[in-house]
Amino acid sequence: MANIKSKIKSIKTMEKARKRNSMIKSRVKTSIKKAKLAITQDSDNAKKLVSDAHHEIHKAKSKGVFHKNTALRKSSRLDLFFNKHMKSA
């Protein structure tokens, strides 16, 4: 544990940010899983769930949780998965 007052405060701030970031990352992972599940089951609302997942990914990018390229990669892989399964269906 830090002894300096400013470091104690910065540790508290970092902990808040870590919790917030992990919550946002979890939300992104969940939305991607839901979208992929809907795609594989040929669900009617798959397109909407993919759109929701893109929204969550880009929101995480704008909040600084993901780097720009990471967000683009996640979106791109989800689109590839969607297009591959829609073409075969």
Curated annotation (Swiss-Prot):
The keyword Repeat does not apply. It holds the Pfam family Ribosomal_S20p. Residues 1-10, 17-29 have a biased composition (Basic residues). Keywords: Ribonucleoprotein, Ribosomal protein, RNA-binding, rRNA-binding. One of its GO terms (biological process) is translation. GO terms for molecular function: small ribosomal subunit rRNA binding; structural constituent of ribosome. Residues 1-29 are annotated as: Disordered. The keyword Magnesium does not apply. GO terms for cellular component: cytosol; small ribosomal subunit. InterPro entries: Ribosomal_bS20, Ribosomal_bS20_sf. Binds directly to 16S ribosomal RNA. Belongs to the bacterial ribosomal protein bS20 family. This is Small ribosomal subunit protein bS20. It comes from Mycoplasmopsis pulmonis (strain UAB CTIP) (Mycoplasma pulmonis).
